[in-house]
Amino acid sequence: MMPMNPKQLKKLMKQLDMKQLDGVKEVIIKLENKEIVIKEPVVTVIRAMGEKMYQIAGGTEEERVVLKISEEDIKLVMEQAGVDYETAKKALEEAGGDLAEAILRLTDQ
């Protein structure tokens, strides 16, 4: 591909109805069991056939596992350890969702 000067690039972007979003700090793509976090990306919005498409490029990528903790699990930890909702939830998160580990951590304090 031949290099383009900035003026030609702006003209082409206008013809394709492309606009760059400024000030984007991060983009999070949420999957069923994890999140992909792209920090400091370059995000371009493209309009074609009545649809908006977002192109995300560059940046630092990290994956985070999303832990799903059920209300039943939180209530069980609350009852067994004699703690409030937030304490039980935090203990479950720290224990990676392991009920026994969360209860042991709370009762061994």
UniProtKB/Swiss-Prot annotation:
Alphabetized UniProt keyword annotations: Protein transport, RNA-binding, Transport
SMART domains recorded: NAC (SM01407)
Top-level taxon: Archaea
Domain NAC-A/B, residue spans: 3-69
One Gene Ontology biological process: protein transport
Pfam families from the UniProt entry: NAC, UBA_HYPK
UniProt cross-references to InterPro entries, sorted A to Z: NAC-like_UBA, NAC_A/B_dom_sf, NAC_arc, Nas_poly-pep-assoc_cplx_dom, UBA-like_sf
Gene Ontology molecular function: any one: RNA binding
Subunit structure comment from the entry: Homodimer. Interacts with the ribosome. Binds ribosomal RNA.
NCBIfam families, A to Z: archaeal-type nascent polypeptide-associated complex protein
Similarity field: Belongs to the NAC-alpha family.
HAMAP family: NAC_arch
Its job: Contacts the emerging nascent chain on the ribosome.
Protein name, per record: Nascent polypeptide-associated complex protein
Species name: Pyrococcus abyssi (strain GE5 / Orsay)
Lineage: Archaea, Methanobacteriati, Methanobacteriota, Thermococci, Thermococcales
Originating gene: nac
